[in-house]
């Protein structure tokens, strides 16, 4: 049994987890998450400098609690991993420096993990996760991507958002409607009392320079603007803004766009399994719609556990364990952090000469 201590500090969650695996069975011994939502709520979004300072403040206590809850001593840990890219650079440094310091102090090997690979790996804690090639819809506050993953975990991005990520659109529309931060849960809650067919909002597409549209790519800024114009028009008419109906209509359109393009991509690439991960993957409308529409095309949907959809260190540990399983190179202790790094570049984190 290999045991990994993992650290996640890429944005506004401070998390430490102890995970292990025996073959294809992955186990969480502890997964402590300290959220900063209340600290950033009054600003309507994450403030990078504030987030980094909170990580510095919280990480020692989160680390101590994770070890205590797991009942595993740090001397019994086999590997230490942390998120190193992409994310907020100041936040990433807190976790990375802590992890590498622990490695030097306790003579442990280090793995720097790509944050999106971590989200992909959250599915390893679900029952009957796909062992063969599959398509992942990774949908969160900072990313909306379609990623093909083969049985060796080699990753290829097939689609992406050209502007706002879906989660970012939820936050912005939530703020526009006067809802609390984060916008995703707030919109989902109030949308339950609304009519999802009340308003005909646009499903925006990205033009292809060769003609037509890019089949697997996303754009949510136009949808956000359409909601803004709708609210302005209702206000000009002197009417009350039907917030539940607007929220429900917005939620429906986002889900439809994500589901339609995911299933199209899976069918075109002859992939029989779709994996849904990331913070927005916790949205019940999206989960139900994906399962219902995929079943019509004989595609099986695998959902990340609800408690592992948002940022957490368990998924980072799972990614590390999978790397170790296939004997990928360990990361250099000289490896730094990067605010941006595509998923196709994840393997560079294990090269002898670090990319940053």
UniProtKB/Swiss-Prot annotation:
Q: What is its main location?
A: cytoplasm
What does this protein's record comment on cofactor binding? Binds 1 Fe(2+) ion per subunit.
CDD domains in the cross-refs: ASKHA_NBD_TsaD_bac (cd24133)
Compartment(s) where it occurs, according to its Swiss-Prot or TrEMBL record: Cytoplasm
Q: Name the cystine pairs.
A: none
**What is the purpose of this protein?**
Required for the formation of a threonylcarbamoyl group on adenosine at position 37 (t(6)A37) in tRNAs that read codons beginning with adenine. Is involved in the transfer of the threonylcarbamoyl moiety of threonylcarbamoyl-AMP (TC-AMP) to the N6 group of A37, together with TsaE and TsaB. TsaD likely plays a direct catalytic role in this reaction.
Q: What is this protein called?
A: tRNA N6-adenosine threonylcarbamoyltransferase
Species the sequence originates in: Prochlorococcus marinus (strain MIT 9215)
